[in-house]
Design a protein with these regions (language model features):
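Extended ligand-binding regions for polar small-molecule ligands
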Residues: 29-35, 48-58, 89-99, 161-181, ...
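A ligand-binding cleft/hinge motif common to bilobed small-molecule-binding domains
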Residues: 118, 132-142, 214-249
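Sec-exported extracytoplasmic/periplasmic mature domains
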Residues: 96-104, 124, 128, 190-194, ...
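Extracytoplasmic small-molecule ligand-binding "clamshell" domains
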Residues: 30-38, 58-134, 205
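N-terminal Lys/Arg-rich, disordered targeting/topogenic segments
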Residues: 1-32
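Bilobed "Venus flytrap"/periplasmic-binding protein-like clamshell domains
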Residues: 74-99, 155-207, 229, 266
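Stable alpha-helical elements in mature extracytoplasmic
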Residues: 60-63, 87-95, 115-119, 127, ...
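Periplasmic-binding protein-like
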Residues: 78, 148-158, 228-272, 290-299
């Protein structure tokens, strides 16, 4: 068998390209431009076909059919965080509109009050279909989540007019309300200390935000980790001062049960639409929220 001389073939290809270079300019480039346009058109048609098929498939899922048979979407929300809670209730309305567009808008949505301790149990026992109540995928990985709708910075907070201090070997207050899963603040602190071990930071655990802030006022600790939303919530009750230092963000998302992935995907479709046409920004402003907290979605 004759042995192939790849060097000769490469030289011949290089020679041909020099004689007939590929260009997109002028008359010589017209065939290539046409071919490129045809390719881009076919690719666009393929992508549109894929995306247009996704929504009907989601809307035909068993969990969506169950909600449509009931004609009511049950959403767990919070009432103790006015600004963000108002946004979340409006997102619940948008999701109900998506799932039950032909139902009576006065009855198609049932808002069920939840808190950090009851949100996931109500998902588990079927009391609610989804939760839109300041929950993050870092809290419990067994559930399904939409893309995030709010990024909440986790700030280092001290007493107002308190003395200056250094972080070295400090004990920081962190809320950890149950033994089943770590709080987002504790996870952020652990991630930070893993890369800044020389600081010797330690976590002092408290069962609730009032317990932790009471300890801060008593001088038991000198600083705490507190999401910005809670800084605003407790700022009128406690003499606290947030610093500009953030340990990261807690990204809140629409949460669906472990057997209802389509509801999380539909939540993503709803949020994508609200972001694309600017309605999410308008919702933020209507509830006094900073549009800079709208998460940057990764491609």
């Amino acid at each position: 068998m004759k042995k192939l001389d790849w060097r000769k073939r490469l030289r011949r290809l290089e020679f041909n390209l020099r004689r007939h270079p590929i260009t997109l300019v002028g008359d010589e480039g017209r065939p290539y431009r046409n071919a490129l346009l045809i390719f881009c058109g076919l690719l666009l048609v393929l992508l549109l076909a894929l995306f247009s098929r996704e929504e009907p498939q989601l809307m035909a899922s068993p969990e969506v059919s169950s909600i449509q048979d009931r004609a009511v979407l049950r959403v767990g929300v919070r009432y103790d965080v006015p600004a963000l809670g108002g946004l979340e209730q409006e997102l619940a309305q948008a999701m109900a509109q998506k799932l039950l567009s032909e139902a009576d808008d006065s009855t198609r949505l049932s808002l069920v009050e939840v808190n950090p301790m009851t949100a996931f149990p109500k998902l588990d026992d079927g009391s609610v279909d989804v939760v839109i109540a300041m929950v993050s995928s870092s809290m419990a990985s067994q559930y399904y989540y939409s893309i995030p709708y709010y990024s909440d910075p986790c700030l280092l907070v001290t007493l107002e007019h308190g003395p200056a201090f250094q972080l070295l070997n400090m004990e920081l207050g962190v809320v950890q309300s149950n033994d089943i899963r770590k709080s987002p603040e504790l996870l952020l602190l652990e991630a930070y200390t893993a890369t800044h071990g020389d600081l010797g930071l330690k976590a002092k655990i408290y069962a609730s935000y009032p317990d932790m802030l009471d300890a801060l006022v008593r001088g038991e600790i000198r600083a705490v980790l507190l999401p910005e939303t809670y800084v605003e919530l407790y700022g009128d009750t406690y003499p606290i001062a947030p610093s500009t230092f953030s340990f990261g963000t807690i990204d809140y998302a629409i949460c669906a049960p472990s057997d209802a992935s389509s509801l999380a995907d539909i939540g993503t479709l709803v949020l994508d639409g609200l972001m694309a046409d600017g309605r999410l920004t308008a919702m933020y402003r209507a509830h006094g929220l900073d549009p800079a907290r709208i998460p940057v979605q990764e491609p």
